[in-house]
Regions:
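NAD(P)H-binding glycine-rich loop region in Rossmannoid oxidoreductase-like domains
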Residues: 1-33
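CheY-like receiver
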Residues: 2-6, 44, 137, 164
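Residues in well-ordered alpha-helical elements
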Residues: 9, 21, 28, 39, ...
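Catalytic helix-loop patch of NAD(P)-dependent Rossmann-fold dehydrogenases
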Residues: 25-43, 52-53, 62-119, 124-126
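Alpha-helical substrate-binding/gating segment
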Residues: 103, 132-145, 155-177
C-alpha cells in the first residue's frame, strides 16, 4: 500500500536482521525479517505499474560456505550452515523465483541484486560486531574474545558498498546493465 501511495522511481531494499548471534537466539524472527521481508518488498514491486528501478541487497553469507580462499560466484550454491546464512540464501532464492515468475516479464521494472560482506563505519555500534567489541574492550582495558578466531573476515567501509548500490541503481536506470 505504501509503495502504491508513494510511487517511487527507485526502491533500495537493505533491511535485514544482520547479526549472526541474534539469528541463533531468534531464528524465526531472523527468517521472517530476511526472507518474508524480502518477499514483501518483491510483492510490492510485482504490483508496480509505473517505471521503477529496484536494488535488493542480501549478503555474501548467502552462499554455502565451502571454506575456500576464493570469492563466490553467481553460479555457486546458496545456503548456509547457520540460520543467518540460510535466511540470506533463502532471500536470494525468493528473489530469483519472483524474477523468473513475474518481474522478468515486466518492462517497467529494472531489478538488480547486490551482496556485501563485513562492513565497518557509519556509527554501527551494534552488539556482537567484532570491531565494535574490540573498541569497547580496549577502552575498558579488557580482554577481547574473538568468536571463530580462525575465520578470515574481509572488511570494507560502509561507504564502499553504498556507492556500489547507488551506481548499480544508476546503471539499471540508464539501461547500462
Amino acid at each position: 500500500d505504501y509503495v502504491q501511495a508513494v510511487k517511487p522511481d527507485f526502491i533500495f531494499h537493505l533491511a535485514a536482521q544482520a547479526i549472526v548471534s541474534t539469528s541463533y537466539k531468534e531464528p524465526f524472527d531472523t527468517i521472517t525479517t530476511n526472507v518474508v521481508g524480502t518477499a514483501s518488498v518483491l510483492e510490492a514491486i510485482r504490483n508496480i505499474t509505473w517505471n521503477c528501478t529496484c536494488v535488493l541487497i542480501t549478503s555474501d553469507k548467502a552462499y554455502d560456505n565451502v571454506e575456500w580462499i576464493w570469492g563466490y560466484r553467481e553460479t555457486d550454491a546458496v545456503g548456509g550452515k547457520d540460520v543467518y546464512s540460510g535466511s540470506k540464501g533463502a532471500a536470494e532464492l525468493t528473489i530469483k523465483c519472483y524474477w523468473k515468475s513475474f518481474i522478468q516479464a515486466m518492462p517497467n521494472i529494472k531489478l538488480g541484486v547486490a551482496r556485501a560482506g563485513n562492513v565497518i563505519g557509519g556509527g554501527d555500534w551494534a552488539k556482537d560486531r567484532i570491531i565494535v567489541d574490540c573498541v569497547k574492550a580496549f577502552s575498558r582495558n579488557e580482554v577481547v574474545e574473538i568468536r571463530s578466531p580462525k575465520a578470515t573476515r574481509p572488511w570494507q567501509h560502509v561507504l564502499e558498498p553504498l556507492s556500489g548500490y547507488l551506481n548499480l541503481g544508476q546503471y539499471l536506470y540508464e539501461g547500462k546493465v
